[in-house]
Amino acid sequence: PAKDLWRKMLTMLFETGHPWITFKDACNLRSPQQHVGVIHSSNLCTEITLNTSNDEIAVCNLGSVNLPQHMKDGVLDQEKVKRTVTTALRMLDNVIDINYYSVDTAKNSNLKHRPVGMGLMGFQDALYMQDTPYCSDAAIEFADRSMEVISYYAIAASSDLAKERGTYPSYDGSLWSQGIFPKDSIEILEKNRGSEFLKVDRSETLDWDQLRAKVKKDGMRNSNVMAIAPTATISNITGVTQSIEPTYQNLYVKSNLSGEFTIVNPYLVRKLKALNLWDDVMINDLKYFEGSLTEISRIPDE
């Protein structure tokens, strides 16, 4: 039965982190490129949903905003985000033209649709900087506002590039050309699935009507502009938490081809130092309990 299959999938997801579940129908309903093909599958990490065919292999060029570097006194610096995203979109668009393509089908797809994916990493770090719990209404509000800012300026940057370099070849007929943004396409899903399943906050803090008018006038350089990648490697290189994920362990060992190295939650270390609790005993306790704080009685509940 379907319920048993669904329960088994969720159990496996809870126990192992796999399989990653993505709903194909919803992806196609909201795809800005539904006029040129069908989304048959996603990539391994499921942040990319692009149409494919016998003549096209989907390719997407990714970049991630280091969110903690855009925090100022516990507040997101929107002007800095704007500058970063604007520069990043230009660089990602350049990658499409100068990239090496091992097969022509990938080159055809990338040049025809020019998708790029701006994402972020260090979301949990940004919450730490605000002393905000991940599981809180304040965290949800910050997620809404930070993603709105990145999305807004990513679309604006792509439209600026379209004015400078021209729209992507398959632009005509896309949802973009109809004035429908990704945030608007949830209404398409709502009409298909029913409003009772889509009770989500759709409040705005930026002038989206002005941006729609700009896109209608100048077009878009890229068919897609947003993608939240896992950033498993680059986040470790830059010393921030992965993507939009919470800290799942305060201390763990990561392995790669270079060997093994220990990852420690630096914010926990700072807090413990501030409480005069950071000593050799605490270090050994954290190692023994594999980063868990629940078994260490010296640490206050708050």
Q: Where are the model-predicted features located?
A:
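Long, C-terminal-biased catalytic regions of enzyme "large/alpha" subunits
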Residues: 1-302
